[in-house]
């Protein structure tokens, strides 16, 4: 049994994104889309938007662009 309460683990999720900040940002934006009525891209038992978003990220269903420029 895993010590992690989150499945997939943070370590596995960080393999899919650049860093923790990106993971939080992508998860929150996708969760908001799901709350607003977007269809889930994965088939899981949970209906919780954050859980669905995390699983979508883990399965590689979510893409994102990194903006290199800061606010000027």
From Swiss-Prot:
Entry keyword annotation includes Phosphoprotein: no
Membrane-spanning residues: none
Record-linked SMART domains: RNA_pol_Rpb6
EC numbers for this chain: 2.7.7.6
An example Gene Ontology molecular-function term: bacterial-type RNA polymerase core enzyme binding
One of the GO BP terms on file: DNA-templated transcription initiation
Broad enzyme group: transferase
InterPro entries the UniProt entry points to: DNA-dir_RNA_pol_omega, Pol_omega/Rpo6/RPB6, RPB6/omega-like_sf
GO cellular component, one term: cytosolic DNA-directed RNA polymerase complex
Catalytic activity: RNA(n) + a ribonucleoside 5'-triphosphate = RNA(n+1) + diphosphate
Database matches in PANTHER family: DNA-DIRECTED RNA POLYMERASE SUBUNIT OMEGA
Quaternary structure, from the entry: The RNAP catalytic core consists of 2 alpha, 1 beta, 1 beta' and 1 omega subunit. When a sigma factor is associated with the core the holoenzyme is formed, which can initiate transcription.
Known function: Promotes RNA polymerase assembly. Latches the N- and C-terminal regions of the beta' subunit thereby facilitating its interaction with the beta and alpha subunits.
Family that this chain belongs to: Belongs to the RNA polymerase subunit omega family.
Descriptive protein name: DNA-directed RNA polymerase subunit omega
Organism: Clostridium botulinum (strain Hall / ATCC 3502 / NCTC 13319 / Type A)
Gene designation per UniProt: rpoZ
């Amino acid at each position: 049994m895993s010590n992690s309460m989150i499945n997939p683990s943070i370590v596995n999720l960080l393999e899919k994104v650049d860093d923790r900040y990106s993971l939080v940002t992508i998860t929150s934006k996708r969760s908001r889309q799901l709350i607003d009525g977007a269809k889930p891209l994965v088939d899981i038992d949970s209906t919780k938007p954050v859980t669905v978003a995390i699983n979508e990220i883990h399965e590689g269903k979510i893409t994102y662009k990194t903006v290199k420029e800061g606010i000027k």
